[in-house]
């Protein structure tokens, strides 16, 4: 047998453990179908290896790609995603944020125009705003939608297309697609 401290050192890869002891511990873990207790680990670290991802529409093609790529990148680094679909409802977003806090997430990727991220800095929870402007100190990742619209129209014109038509966005609702439409229409008017 070995002590609980030795098992802990093997699992957490801390301190010197001989190769023989390490193999012995792993063999016993496999035989017993042992799974580390993530809650206990989170208690000592004060966070889990989970990243909260809050998106407004889980079925939108843009967010489908974002979810897939973030999940792959997180998995490579040993993290899991906690996926939340807010349906652009501020109260739902707040509920999800509270859930992320109570679940001790390591960070939050947030696509919201309603939530102010200052409170998370006070709690030392890293937040990245995606496709929405954030507070001054918050990391924000945004597409240049205007330029994207221009590039799309220019490409179609260069391919010989005429009488271009643009579909996108929701009438009366401020959306990133509006900026793409502006860029698209500018190129169409100039040519």
Name the predicted role of every residue range:
Residues 1-49:
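N-terminal helix-turn-helix DNA-binding module of bacterial transcription factors
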Residues 4-9, 43-57, 155, 162-170:
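Short beta-strand segments enriched in small/hydrophobic residues
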Residues 22, 48, 67, 124, ...:
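ATP/adenylate-binding site constellation spanning eukaryotic-like Ser/Thr protein kinases
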Residues 30-68, 76-79, 99-102:
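N-terminal helix-turn-helix/winged-helix DNA-binding helices
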Residues 31, 69-77, 95, 101, ...:
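Bacterial carbohydrate/catabolite-sensing allosteric modules
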Residues 57-59, 87-88, 170-175:
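Short histidine/acidic/glycine/proline-rich micro-motifs that form metal-
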Residues 72-118:
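Central regulatory/effector-binding core of bacterial HTH transcription factors
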Residues 118-124:
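Acidic (Asp/Glu)-rich catalytic clusters
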């Amino acid at each position: 047998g070995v002590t609980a401290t030795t098992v802990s050192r093997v699992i957490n890869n801390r301190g010197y453990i001989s190769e023989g002891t390490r193999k012995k511990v792993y063999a016993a873990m496999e035989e017993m179908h042992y799974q580390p207790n993530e809650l206990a680990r989170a208690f000592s670290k004060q966070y889990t290896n989970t990243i909260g991802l809050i998106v407004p529409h889980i079925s939108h093609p843009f967010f489908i790609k974002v979810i897939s790529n973030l999940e792959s990148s997180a998995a490579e680094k040993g993290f899991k995603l906690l996926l939340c679909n807010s349906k652009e409802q501020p109260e739902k977003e707040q509920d999800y944020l509270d859930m992320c806090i109570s679940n001790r997430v390591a960070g939050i990727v947030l696509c919201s125009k309603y939530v102010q991220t200052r409170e998370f800095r006070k709690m030392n929870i890293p937040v990245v705003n995606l496709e929405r402007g954030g507070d001054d100190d918050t990391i924000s990742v945004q597409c240049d939608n205007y330029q994207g619209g221009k590039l799309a129209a220019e490409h179609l014109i260069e391919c010989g297309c005429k009488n271009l038509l643009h579909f996108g966005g929701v009438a009366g609702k401020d959306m990133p697609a509006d900026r793409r439409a502006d860029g698209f229409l500018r190129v169409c008017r100039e040519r």
